[in-house]
Amino acid sequence: MQHTGNCETLIVNSCFGSTCARSIPVFIDSCDLTAEVSRDEETRLARSVPVVLEKIESIIEKIFQTSGPNIVHDKDRAKIALCRLLLGPVAVPCFCEEWDTNDYLSKSGCKCLGPILYIHTSRCRCSDIPVFKFSIMKDYYASHVFRGLLSLKEWNTHLPNVLCTCELSMSDRYVATVFPKQNSIYLEYYPYFLCYLCRYLTVIEIEQCTNDLISLLGPKVAQRVIIHFKLLFGFRHKPHMGTVDSWFWENFFMLELHKLWLTVVKHNRVTTDFFNVVYEKIQNYKQYAIKTLRMSSKAVPAIQRFCLAKFKQQLLYLNIKVTVKKNKRELCLNGFVYGKTLYVVESSQLIFRNLLLLYYDYSLPDECKTKEENVLTTHYIRVISRLSFKQSRSAVPPGVKPDFTFVAQLPKRKELPNVPGGIDFAEITSVRHGAVILNAFNTNKVMNLKATISKRANFVYHRIPKTMTHSFVMYKHTFKEPAFTVSTFVSNDDLDMSSLNINIRGPYCDFLYALGVYKMHVSIQDLFLPAFVCNSNNSVDLQGLEDQDVVRNRKKKVYWITNFPCMISNANKVNVGWFKAGTGIIPRVSGKDLQNVLLQELNNVREIPGLVFDMDLHQLLVLLEQRNLHQIPFLVKQFLIFLRLGLLMGYGNSRRNKVHDIMLHLISNGLFDFNKNSVANTKIKHGCALVGTRLANNVPKIIARQKKMKLDHMGRNANSLAVLRFIVKSGEHKNKTVFIKLLEYLAETSTAINTRNEVARLLLTLTTNMKT
């Protein structure tokens, strides 16, 4: 803390704020400086050394500090440190007098036939700190070496150079990042470096970074990178308690288990028992637990102790995805065997596979134990390919500047999904083909999900038939508010859990509300989301069609025509039913599959010859649908259509755009908004249950020729031509002049031949009736 007058200023020094590392070229004037001492250095690097965790952590922190001031995120620092470790240790030999040595020079006594540096201290204007002047010598003893990590030149632009830059005429893309001699790096330290890196990077990110480095530097450097990558993930021997302090492994794995514990949505006796047993195994049998937790995905262990009922509950509460197969002794990843059954978990949940093995007391037989590869000194020297800078430079195409910098970027904010619960729970699904938009509305969904039974004491076992071998519907509940139906499936091999089949309409919030209502009435302890949408029915209206009959009278893409007034087409192996007035139904699909079906069907509809859209009316009706997230009722649509038609006749066709702007303004301000819970336009039992059967049957009707007729007799989506045709043919028109003007306007403005012919027939009927 620094005092300034009466004020106190707290100065905190960041561990990444400054660095003691320096940069030095490894290739000068066509000379590879590392070639002569590489074998001796590799022998030194691979020998066994005492492991002091505090020293190792100090070294890796200094490697982190070399990232530079522009790198502000720890993940980016970790990636640069990882790349330096993957390129591995390197040494640059030199000769200097004793009075010129410093903390970066370590003693060495090997004779070098090739080039070495002769250095001496000098002050130069190119640097604010003392640097070395140098010259190249051959066939001379190297008195000292600079030791550090191989790096790329662009990573070290911010680091001070050991040599005077005035004398550096040219240099390679590779440089060495050297550290003080008390921070020497040995291969024994590599696995401990990984433990530090894993604080900021996942294993997948480490592998991805390794692949990116190999693809950048080319195949000639790949072998060097791969051997150091293997060193990160492998100990030379099983860790001894004398070498590795017990708290190191204990704290490391405990920290990871605490992270998993925090990801569990709900904690109860099942999750508590699971993690308590795992913690106990790690505490009491550390070596056994570490071996089990590090088990490869290729291993398929067999366990002897297993409880299926408890296992099913663990899968639900820990959200583990498991596939059950027969054990056919085939190659299978991420699995384990119990009896004749193979249980396979998802690749992203391999840690849970190993934790389950630990929970169920899995022990690897001696004859099946995997022999850990021992990284011997001779093996390391034989495998690692010394980096020949003359050859490796050719891996980069000429004229292409290599770029492997980590640019510090602000983390992107993850956008929330537009539809709560995902696209499968969307009330409206829209697709576009050119200027035509098709909106599909969900009429009902059927979903499956798992639940656990809370009161086993109230469950009567003898009610389940002894001969039952499959699940069946034990209970069925129908609710009015919110309107939904739940079927409960119970199986005789599982008395703790049940499967629910829910039939409901509405958004995801209504679904969650329905689950809460259901839980209040039955003995359910927990419901497990997400639910799986197994069936979904949707309805569509083609808006703005001048002649709606052409959709059902088409000849192409027709799959089946039923006796019922419905034409069946097929799109993406889904049957789409088309009724009168351009109304269609799409069963079974939801989400992306529904979008694909809509696009295919809309494309088929656009290919119908003689199909004409009134695009202004189409835009208005689509906007009203999207505003209310519901199909437009018959009365609302007719009010909008004939109001617009009257305005067009009053203003004249020349001011059509003015009328369109007026209608857009009225729709945007909610003049045509309607109640979505209207039962007059639905046949869904859930909706009828809201108001009761008698009131639900009270659909608005009109009297035509002394006969009651439902308003949607012509179809909910009927256009003006269909309504006028019905009125003219029924003869229930008192003021024929109004209808003649409407029909004449339609004939004048329509571009569809079928529409003009139909209007001409209707006008002929009206004029004939007027004469008679």
Curated annotation (Swiss-Prot):
Transmembrane domains' residue ranges: none
Protein's recorded name: Protein U58
InterPro entries: Herpes_UL87_C, Herpes_UL87_N
Stated family: Belongs to the herpesviridae UL87 family.
Taxonomic source organism: Human herpesvirus 6B (strain Z29)
